Design a protein with these regions (language model features):
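Structural signature of Gram-negative outer-membrane beta-barrels, strongest in the C-terminal barrel
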Residues: 314, 440-444, 448-450, 463-610, ...
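Short acidic/polar hinge/loop motifs at secondary-structure boundaries
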Residues: 59, 144, 179-207, 260
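A beta-strand signature from Gram-negative outer-membrane beta-barrel systems
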Residues: 197-238, 793
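Flexible loop and strand-edge segments within Gram-negative outer membrane beta-barrel domains
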Residues: 280-282, 296-302, 316-378, 382-384, ...
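C-terminal beta-signal and adjacent terminal beta-strands/loops
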Residues: 4, 558, 646, 652, ...
Length: 794
């Protein structure tokens, strides 16, 4: 802590000498600001980088004429000789031209500082705004967009739930602009579908164990970076309207939506506001049957709003305030008819009959879905401590309300709801040092303070998961050393300290398997629980040759098991008797990136171990969820290839993801068993081809293929019938084709048409299969459906 006290004192008392400054903005040839440009005066060993608005300031420059270098991957380097006089500020506007010989790279900021993608020793997928716009022509469901674009992410469940949509077989943390949306204290696993794709400028997916943002990142994290108030005029905007329908059967299947955004710059103020409304109709499978409505996407109303306001206090200071809401509520006219299955023999031959919906209603059931609210206040101060350091701090508030479907697993039935509130404060420093021309050292360090209040009850007032009140604080430091523009070395530490207070409560009678076997109510005395964890990461990447950019890395992540699931089925008399500790995940990774003029290849292999397993496991002997005590070993690989030809008029690409996992009892490493489908996804293959015959027309064909996964043998239950255990049902693969076309009516007006499941494939999403023993989730996927939309920019 002494380090931070000293840093804070320096921050409050820093001063500068009476010397010159260089201030400016950097733009591309279209006049758009460029983020992350290196500005360096080698003779003075001074440097900085441009901010999100392309602005920069370099202070304490002595009198004289010096060469200033402006460089960034994907742009031609510019060198200007500038004369400085004492006590003077030189202002410039610098334009950089794209380098046709180099592939432009996205700057990644999810790791708390801007970094080049090819210089990070880790596996990262960035879904840029163009990809989001193109794929949004087909769907507004972000789960399906990420399913196609992110190798290593399991396929979508076809619902608004992401239970089973793991990242490399591990749980993931979902964030919006760095603010956590997941509810790890009682993980409802609805976090991925938490924002409108229209409001996203890019998605950053960091894979492998990570603790850079704390609890929950065993498999990595997804960070939605929302659009910023960057504009050249007082008012600019985008209008998007669309209609969609199932084509297999059209009865009440029509849906529609509208989105409007406005942005602008007025003096020192920048603003961005948006709102959208969407309604979906009935959903039918390839045979024209109503899709199972549980967690469904049918008959859903979605409201979204986003607002950001920035004020430039000075050349180096900026304050911004923002917030967003996302309400997605399903009010379906259908009730579920649950699926069923029969296993015939010890070989595992089976018949699986999926569930579906029939007209009807459940008395008292409220609409299901999510209500999310975010608010944040940010302060930026650049070029302090002799121009070497940028300081950022943000205060945020996040509220989640997840409303689940009616279930007869509760005594007398009921509908549960997760309520979570988070309050956070995060001061962060980024320091860049250039001891010589061949060495650049970057340090990121700061504090995370978090208050999280979570519970889960029933809408009728019964409490299922007691009030959990957590306060955590963490300190971290991440270092990067760049040597001779050839090597990037990275290492970091994060220490977390968590303290939880849990109220006294009584467990609810509950039947986890829905078989009428209700656990009795237990009175549990509340108390306090404490956890701490020190996580380490290190990596190295060789960046000299674009044709082969290899890396190797090691990282750790940690999470508290889904504490709410444990508490609601507790057998102990006191929470202090529950043996619970963080699950620590260690991730080993090797990969490389190869880039040629028109060709890009990325491949990675990984091995991940967790000494306690992750999450919770179902114990059939006591009919309850318990903390997982079995170590898990997960391994896999990913490959992605992209190629462009004919002046980028033809674009083709493919990716393949494979993951497998094993577990064993503590002390019995030789008796290995496979992990279930809720953890390990079946292999995934994607491919696309995009053709742009003219400047006005583009068309794409995309394929998603899910492979088979059949790792488990059936067993005889108490009635001498063959069956499969929880999450161990075989998965049978399928292939989906989606087509879309975009046509520019004018430079600022375009229309698009998309057809999903082009061949009307009858299929069951992976979760509908491996979770078949639960019956609740076994539904079919949607048949052929279409979306027609129009986009207008002004």
């Amino acid at each position: 802590m002494k380090f931070y006290i000293v840093a804070a004192a320096l921050f409050l008392t820093f001063g500068v000498s009476a010397q010159s400054s260089l201030k400016g903005k950097i733009k591309d040839e279209q006049g758009q600001p460029i983020y992350g440009v290196n500005i360096h005066i080698s003779e003075l060993q001074k440097g900085t980088t441009s901010d999100e608005n392309g602005g920069f300031i370099l202070k304490n420059i002595k009198e004289g004429s010096f060469k200033v270098t402006f460089s960034m991957v994907g742009f031609k380097t510019e060198i200007r000789k500038i004369a400085f006089t004492q006590n003077n500020t030189v202002e410039i506007l610098q334009t950089l031209k794209e380098d046709s010989e180099s592939l432009s790279e996205v700057v990644v900021s999810a790791s708390r500082r801007s970094e080049y993608l090819s210089e990070i020793p880790a596996s990262i997928t960035v879904v840029n705004q163009k990809q989001l716009t193109d794929l949004s022509n087909s769907t507004t469901n972000i789960n399906e967009i990420l399913e196609f674009t992110v190798p290593g992410l399991a396929v979508s469940t076809g619902t608004f739930s992401n239970w089973g949509q793991t990242l490399r077989g591990r749980s993931l943390l979902v964030m919006i602009d760095g603010v956590p949306q997941s509810t790890p204290l009682r993980n409802g696993q609805l976090g991925i579908k938490s924002v409108s794709p229209n409001d996203i400028s890019r998605v950053e997916v960091i894979k492998g164990a990570t603790s850079i943002f704390g609890n929950g990142g065993n498999g990595g994290f997804i960070n939605y970076i929302t659009k910023k108030p960057n504009a050249n005029e007082k008012i600019e905007g985008t209008t998007n309207i669309w209609g969609a329908s199932n084509l297999t059967k059209t009865k009440d299947a029509f849906g529609f939506g509208a989105y409007q955004s406005l942005r602008g710059k007025i003096d020192k103020f920048n603003y961005y506001v948006s709102g959208s409304y969407e309604e979906t109709g009935n959903k039918y499978d390839a045979d024209g049957k109503v899709i199972l409505p549980t967690y469904g996407l049918d008959n859903t109303r979605i409201y979204t709003a986003l607002a950001k306001l920035e004020y430039e206090i000075s050349d180096r200071q900026k304050i911004s305030i923002g917030g967003n809401l996302y309400n997605s509520l399903q009010d379906t006219p259908f009730i579920p008819v649950l699926g069923s299955f029969e296993v015939y023999n010890e070989n595992g031959d089976y018949t699986l009959i999926p569930g579906h919906g029939i007209e009807g209603s459940i008395e008292g059931q409220e609409p299901t879905g999510s209500k999310l609210y975010n608010g944040n206040l940010k302060y930026d101060l650049n070029s302090i401590f002799d121009g070497t350091t940028d300081f950022k701090a943000d205060v945020y508030y996040q509220k989640t309300k997840n409303i689940f479907f009616y279930s007869d697993k509760f005594e007398n039935g009921g509908q549960s709801v997760i309520n979570a509130k988070k309050y956070g404060l995060r001061p962060n420093f980024n320091t860049t040092l250039t001891p010589n021309e061949s060495t650049e050292i970057s340090l990121t360090y700061g504090l995370d303070l978090l208050k999280d209040k979570t519970n889960q009850g029933l809408l009728d007032g019964r409490l299922w998961v007691p009030n959990i009140d957590m306060f955590s604080w963490a300190q971290y430091i991440q270092s990067t050393v760049k040597l001779n523009d050839e090597w990037v070395l990275k290492a970091g530490l994060r220490y977390d300290d968590m303290n939880l207070t849990i109220d006294d409560y009584n467990t609810l009678p509950y039947s986890p398997l829905g078989d009428g076997n209700f656990n009795p109510s237990v009175a549990v005395e509340g108390g306090k629980l404490g956890f701490d964890n020190l996580a380490f990461n290190a990596g190295v990447r060789y960046i000299k040759h674009q044709e082969f950019i290899p890396y190797v890395s090691y990282s750790q992540g940690f999470s508290i098991a889904d504490l709410g699931s444990v508490l609601r089925s507790a057998k102990a008399d006191s929470v202090e008797d529950i043996q619970l500790e963080p699950a620590v995940t260690k991730n080993y990774e090797f990969g490389f990136l190869s880039k040629f003029k028109n060709f890009r290849l990325e491949a990675v292999g990984y091995y991940s171990v967790s000494n306690l397993g992750t999450g919770v496991a179902f114990d059939e002997n006591i009919n309850s969820f318990v903390p997982s005590k079995k170590p898990q070993n997960i391994y896999g690989g990913e490959i992605a290839i992209d190629y462009t030809a004919f002046d980028s008029k033809l674009q083709v690409g493919t990716s393949y993801s494979y993951v497998e996992g094993l577990t064993h009892n503590v002390g019995d490493e030789n008796n290995l068993t496979y992990l279930g489908g809720d953890v390990i996804a079946a292999p995934k293959l994607t491919a696309y081809v995009t053709w742009v015959p003219t400047n006005k027309i583009s068309t794409s064909l995309r394929m998603t293929n899910l492979g088979d996964r059949n790792r488990f043998n059936p067993y005889l239950d108490a009635n001498d019938n063959y069956t499969f255990r929880h999450t161990q049902f075989p998965v049978e693969g399928y292939t989906l084709l989606n087509w879309s076309m975009n046509y520019k009516l004018q430079e600022n007006i375009s229309v698009s048409l998309a057809v999903n499941n082009l061949l009307n494939e009858y299929y069951l999403p992976a979760r509908s299969q491996w979770a078949a023993p639960l019956r609740t989730f076994t539904g079919t996927g949607e048949g052929t459906n279409a979306k027609l939309s129009m986009l207008y920019n002004f």
